[in-house]
Each structure stands twice: as C-alpha cells, then as structure tokens.
Curated annotation (Swiss-Prot):
Region (Disordered): 1-25
Keyword Transport: yes
Family named by the database record: Belongs to the major facilitator superfamily.
Function per UniProt: Lysosomal dipeptide uniporter that selectively exports lysine, arginine or histidine-containing dipeptides with a net positive charge from the lysosome lumen into the cytosol. Could play a role in a specific type of protein O-glycosylation indirectly regulating macrophages migration and tissue invasion. Also essential for liver homeostasis.
Motif position, Dileucine internalization motif: 11-12
Membrane topology according to the record: Multi-pass membrane protein
Entry-linked InterPro entries: MFS, MFS_dom, MFS_trans_sf, MFSD1
Annotated protein name in UniProt: Lysosomal dipeptide transporter MFSD1
Length: 468
C-alpha cells in the first residue's frame, strides 16, 4: 500500500523525496516524461489510444488475407470457389453465438485485461494454424485456423471498445471510436495491397510457387497478430497500473443479454436487422471474390485488381469519422441509410452491366459503405429501451454473421456454376431487398411518429422536453 501511495505521489508535480523534502521543479524533458507516466494525463491516455488502435490491427489485416490471395489460394490449394469461400464462412460461424457471450465473458469470467489477451491469443493461434494448413497442403487445417481466428476476432473488437469506454468519456469517445474504425480499415487496406507483393517475394526466395509459398506468406502476415498481442499485454499492464494509482474500476462492457427480450422486439427493429444482413452480405463476400472479376472482365493485373478492391477500405478510413459527424449534426438517419443503399445498388449495377472504369463503382461503394455504418447502427438505440440494447446489438451481430456465413457459401457456388454476371445479379437482389426494407422502415416509422427520421435539432428538443 505504501508503494502504491509513493508511486501516486511521485506522479504529482510537487512530489516529495524519501526524506519528505520538496523536490526541485523538474526540467521540461522530465515534465514530459512525468505526463507520459501519469494515467490521469492526456499524454498517457494518447499512448493508451495508440495501443488500442493497434490492438485490432492484426485481426483486420489477416481477416481479408484470403481475398488478397484469392488467385494463389485457389491455385496452390487446388480448390474451387465454393471451398475457397468456406474460409470466410468458418470465420463467421462461431460469431453467430459469440456475439451474445463475448461481453459476458469479458465482464464476468475473464475481465477486460485477461479477456483481451485470451482473444488476441486465439487470433494469433488461428492465423498460425491457417498458415500451417498452407505449408502442409491441408485445406481442412486452413479451415480450422479460420474457425479459431473467428473465435478471437469479433470478441477482440468488443474488448477494444470496452477499453475505449473505460479510458475515454463523453465527446472524446466518438472520436476514439472513429479512430479505431479508421485503423481497422487501414489494416484491411495494407493487407489488400501488401500480401500479393509479399507472395511474389517469397516465391522468388523459394524458387517456385505452391502451397509452401502460400503458407510462408500467411505466416509472415501473422506477425501483425503478434503485434496486436503485444499491444494487449501492454494495455493490460497500463490498465492495471492506472487502476492501482487512480483507484478506478476495471472496464466492463455493460452489456446485459436476455434472449427472452427478442420476443419484445418491434417491427422497426426487425426491419433494421433485415437491412443490415441484406446489405453486408453484398459487401464482404463481394470483396472476398471480386479480385478475379477485375482481372477477367477489365483486364487489370493482379496488383492493380488488389488496389481497386482495397479502395472501399481506403475511403472508409477517413470518411467514417466524417460521416459520423455529419449524421450526428443532421439526424435524418433513414434518409442517410436510403442514400447509402441506393448508391450501393448503383455500384453493383455499374459493375454488372457496364464496362465503365471500376474505380468509379468501387469509390461509390466505399462512400456508401461508410455512410451506412454511421447511420444504421445508431438507429437501434432509438427503437429499443436502454435495458435491451445489449440483446438487440448482440442479435444484430449474430444474424449478420449467420447471413455472411450462409451467403459466402452460396456466392461461391454461384460463381463456380454460373459465373460473375449471375453473382452480381445475386448481390443486386440482396441490396434490392435491403432497399425495400428501408422503404418499409420509413413508412412504418412515419406511422409511429417518425422518431428515426427526426433532425438533430428536433431530437435535442424532444430530449429537453422529456427531462422537464
């Protein structure tokens, strides 16, 4: 206890030495170091923020390894598109369940610090097993690796958000979430543009292409997961130290999951779920498969196709915080969701039925993808009571992962049997169903008072009137 008090005193500007004498004012360099070591100081929290951002970098970098190496995986492992897409399906399957229990495990079982470390270990182990599957030419081992990777990936994102809430409050929090999302998109972008180049370098070193080259490339990519694990360990130490010095509680997700709440979900909430699933199944499986489409239809090189494929994430990185601020300032969530879905539909139609430069469609897709996330997910909080938020978001993520798992397999089957045109028509149908759900949501919500489409000013007025 005396050591804790001494450490806390040492961080104060007027800290005293062992004899209780006043110490001299520290020089500028010493003052800066003191600020970095003080958990209550902004400089220290910025260090923590940097670690938080890199905590999920490895997971997002490695998630789309299959998309970046689509040609190489199918050729070296001698699998068709249906089997290739199982690498995405196996990631999603565990998260159909874990979306409900990730927060519970962090709050009640492991705690935020151990939970983050354990989920980071799952991500690392999963990526290593995935790479070993390539080295030993065992596709089933690659599937197992993706399953283990999936167990850690989504739950690690929950832990990342929990740390953010624990260290940052109020308006700071929106910026922190925006920065974390931007870093995630940077991870995906770097993967799309780096892994193909890395494969060619490994191929040159080993003398030939093949499953061994693929496995070694994936193993090198796994270094990013080790970086994330190091960040998890550093965060655990700094969080424990801050708890000891500032006497603050360990961060918790605050989620309360009650599956019985599902029966009370309103029609607008179910429509939001349908919009979410039908929209995202036309984004992530599409990104996983579209690289070969760009080389076959438009004649791009493999590296150029990767660059086009990554533009969705490139745009999302800076635009997500900007669109988040825009939606916060204007309100009108349904209108913004409608704009995002219509733009996405236009992008898929362009890619399917025209020979226009695909950069146009993919840039539009990047903008609409960023806008939808900022406008759709906050709407859940407007249609369910606060005590049901954990269940609602858990259920939304669960059926999203279920949809991604099923549609990934279906998309692979369509591509194997019918080709890219039919696949694009399938994605257009999914987005059209999402668009129909947005229109229905607008009509239902309008009949119930229209709170989802209030302007920001009207929401503030309603909030003030309720407080009075």
């Amino acid at each position: 206890m005396e050591d804790e008090e001494e450490e806390a005193r040492a961080l104060l500007p007027g800290g005293s030495d062992e004899a209780g004498r006043e110490t001299r004012a520290p020089p500028a360099a010493s003052g800066a170091l003191q600020a970095l070591c003080d958990p209550s100081h902004l400089a220290h929290r910025l260090v923590v923020l940097l670690l938080m951002c890199f905590l999920g970098f490895g997971s997002y970098f490695c998630y789309d390894n299959p998309a970046a190496l689509q040609i190489q995986v199918k050729r070296d492992m001698q699998v068709n598109t249906t089997k290739f897409m199982l690498l995405y399906a196996w990631y999603s399957w565990p998260n159909v369940v874990l979306c409900f229990f990730g927060g519970f495990l962090i709050d009640r079982v492991f705690g935020i610090r151990w939970g983050t470390i354990i989920f980071s270990c799952f991500v690392c182990i999963g990526q290593v097993v995935f790479a070993l599957g390539g080295i030993f030419n065992a596709f089933w081992l690659m599937e197992l690796g993706r399953f283990v990777f999936g167990i850690g990936g989504e739950s690690l994102a929950v832990a990342q958000n929990t740390y953010a809430v624990s260290w940052f409050k109020g308006k700071e929090l929106n910026l922190v979430f925006g920065l974390q999302l931007s870093m995630a998109r940077i991870g995906s972008t770097v993967n799309m543009n780096l892994m193909g180049w890395l494969y060619s370098k490994v191929e040159a070193s080993l003398g030939s292409a093949g499953h061994t080259t693929l496995g070694v490339t994936l193993m090198i990519g796994g270094i990013t997961c080790i970086l994330s694990l190091v960040c998890a360990l550093a965060l655990a130490y700094l969080d424990q130290r801050a708890e000891r010095i500032l006497h603050k509680e360990q961060g918790k997700t605050g989620e309360v999951i009650k599956l019985t709440d599902v029966k009370d979900f309103s029609l607008p909430l179910w429509l939001i779920f349908i919009i979410c699933v039908c929209y995202y199944v036309a984004i992530f499986p599409f990104i996983g498969l579209v690289k070969v489409f760009f080389t076959e239809k438009f004649g791009f090189s493999s590296q150029a196709a990767s660059a086009i494929n990554s533009v969705v994430y490139v745009i999302s990185a800076p635009m997500s915080p900007i669109f988040g601020l825009l939606v916060d300032k204007t309100g009108k969530n349904i209108i913004w969701v409608l704009c995002a879905v219509v733009t996405t539909l236009a992008s898929h139609i362009m890619l399917a039925f025209t020979l226009w430069n695909p950069w146009i469609a993919m840039c539009l897709l990047g903008l609409s993808y960023s806008l939808l996330a900022c406008a759709l997910w906050p709407m859940v909080a407007f249609v369910v009571p606060e005590h049901q938020l954990g269940t609602a978001y858990g259920f939304m993520q669960s059926i999203q992962n279920l949809g991604l798992a099923v549609i990934s397999i279906i998309a692979g089957m369509i591509l194997d049997t019918r080709g890219y045109l039919f696949l694009e028509v399938f994605f257009i149908a999914c987005v059209s169903l999402s668009l129909l759900s947005v229109v229905l949501l607008y009509m239902v919500n309008h009949a119930q008072g229209g709170n989802l489409n209030y302007s920001a000013k009207k929401r503030e007025e309603m909030k003030l009137s309720h407080e009075e």
